[in-house]
Amino acid sequence: MSPRPAFDPTLYLVTDTGLCGPRGVPAVVRAAVAGGVSAVQVRAKDGGDRERLALVRAVQDVLRGTGVALIVDDAVDIALIAGADGVHLGQSDLPAAEVRRLAPDLLLGLSVSTPAQAAAVDPAVVDYLGVGPVRATATKPDAAAPLGPEGLRAVVAAAPVPCVAIGGIHPDNLDALRGSGIAGFCVVSEVCAAADPEAAARALRTQWHGRAS
């Protein structure tokens, strides 16, 4: 078994094809990485598997040589075929332990929304957790009730692996996540829908690092 890829979750971008619009996902990713995005998850719910594979490969071309990890949402087969760095699973996706047996070298992320779900994670199987939603978010209307900063802290405290916050995170509420113990935070619309994704990413990263305590 080879070591799993390096992974910096500080500023974790989850792509949204619709929000990226005519610019396209790869162009937005390129700009966002220039602004300081440190990990990218390709989330594409529309289209067939071939289209999703083509998108993952296009983003992979953008990320090559940058050191930024490429994570694929849900689709273990596409992650393996493309040679991505990892896959991110939801609670209703394939069991994490089964995926780990199938893909021992992939980074494996899992979405959780309660302390009990976090505490049940096997750190030999799962590398990191996506915790949320922290706030209400329009990009995932079927998400659980918002945790808020206190709920986020409770989930992180129960987790045996690093946690990344997700859901409705914007510059005006980012500072409320300080002291929660998170290893990083995810954004979707804040970067994908921005007129200048590079500037949006840079502003988020500067705010997080510039006022970190």
Swiss-Prot record:
Entry keywords, A to Z: Magnesium, Metal-binding, Thiamine biosynthesis, Transferase
UniProt keyword tRNA processing, yes or no: no
GO cellular component assignments: cytoplasm
Amino acids binding Mg(2+): D74, D93
Gene Ontology biological process terms in this record: thiamine biosynthetic process; thiamine diphosphate biosynthetic process
Cofactor note: Binds 1 Mg(2+) ion per subunit.
Classification via CDD domains: TMP_TenI
EC code(s) of this entry: 2.5.1.3
Keyword Glycoprotein listed: no
Signal peptide range: none
Gene Ontology MF terms: magnesium ion binding; thiamine-phosphate diphosphorylase activity
Cofactor(s) annotated in UniProt: Mg(2+)
Pathway entry: Cofactor biosynthesis; thiamine diphosphate biosynthesis; thiamine phosphate from 4-amino-2-methyl-5-diphosphomethylpyrimidine and 4-methyl-5-(2-phosphoethyl)-thiazole: step 1/1
InterPro entries: Aldolase_TIM, ThiamineP_synth_sf, ThiamineP_synth_TenI, TMP_synthase
Reaction catalyzed: 2-[(2R,5Z)-2-carboxy-4-methylthiazol-5(2H)-ylidene]ethyl phosphate + 4-amino-2-methyl-5-(diphosphooxymethyl)pyrimidine + 2 H(+) = thiamine phosphate + CO2 + diphosphate; 2-(2-carboxy-4-methylthiazol-5-yl)ethyl phosphate + 4-amino-2-methyl-5-(diphosphooxymethyl)pyrimidine + 2 H(+) = thiamine phosphate + CO2 + diphosphate; 4-methyl-5-(2-phosphooxyethyl)-thiazole + 4-amino-2-methyl-5-(diphosphooxymethyl)pyrimidine + H(+) = thiamine phosphate + diphosphate
SUPFAM superfamilies assigned to the protein according to its UniProt record, in alphabetical order: Thiamin phosphate synthase
Domain of life (superkingdom): Bacteria
Gene3D superfamilies xrefs: Aldolase class I (3.20.20.70)
Enzyme class: transferase
Binding residues for 4-amino-2-methyl-5-(diphosphooxymethyl)pyrimidine: Q41, V42, R43, A44, K45, D73, S111, K140
Function, in words: Condenses 4-methyl-5-(beta-hydroxyethyl)thiazole monophosphate (THZ-P) and 2-methyl-4-amino-5-hydroxymethyl pyrimidine pyrophosphate (HMP-PP) to form thiamine monophosphate (TMP).
PANTHER family from the UniProt entry: THIAMINE-PHOSPHATE PYROPHOSPHORYLASE (PTHR20857), THIAMINE-PHOSPHATE SYNTHASE (PTHR20857:SF15)
Protein name: Thiamine-phosphate synthase
Organism: Kineococcus radiotolerans (strain ATCC BAA-149 / DSM 14245 / SRS30216)
